[in-house]
A protein has these predicted regions:
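Bacterial N-terminal signal peptides
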Residues: 1-4
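Concave beta-strand-loop units of leucine-rich repeat
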Residues: 30-31, 40-143
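Post-signal peptide N-terminal segment of mature Sec-exported envelope proteins
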Residues: 16-41
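Bacterial signal peptide processing site
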Residues: 7-11
Length: 143
């Protein structure tokens, strides 16, 4: 079976050309990687191991009812995390095995609803995590 990703420059995806459509998200995540609420809004998205780039997070951030976002083993880095600020319902994010550093944690600090953050292994430091925890009291950070 082959998938053609509309709006992507290559079959590998992750080019930042997602277009923001649900079809693109569904093709990337697959049926098991997406959960919706009773109004059809995406609340859970698992894109772990997929060809997701920083620019793709702008499309993901349009889904403001998102509560859980799994981006482990993707091409996401610090710049992409700036797009996540509109996700005021986001509770859990996994950024394990990504290029995230302390600079990216500053963007996550703006997502006040976060309760669990998975960052192992990444390039974050103890100091960066301490700063994040100070900005988000009660957040659990695993790194």
């Amino acid at each position: 079976m082959a998938f053609v990703l509309v709006g992507c420059d290559s079959p590998q995806g992750g080019t930042g050309n997602s277009g923001g459509g649900d079809e693109w998200l569904l093709s990337q995540a697959g049926e098991a990687g997406v959960k919706k609420d009773n109004r059809g809004r995406i609340t859970y998205l698992d894109l772990s191991g997929k060809a997701i780039a920083n620019a793709d997070l702008a499309a993901i951030a349009k889904h403001t009812q998102l509560r859980e976002l799994y981006l482990a083993k993707t091409g996401v880095g610090d710049e992409g995390l700036a797009h996540l600020r509109p996700l005021t319902n986001l509770r859990i994010i996994s950024l394990a095995n990504t290029q995230v550093t302390d600079a990216g944690l500053k963007h996550l600090a703006a997502v006040r609803s976060l309760r669990q953050i998975f960052l192992y292994p990444t390039k974050v430091t103890d100091a960066g995590v301490a700063e994040l925890k100070a900005a988000l009291p009660g957040v659990q950070v695993r790194y």
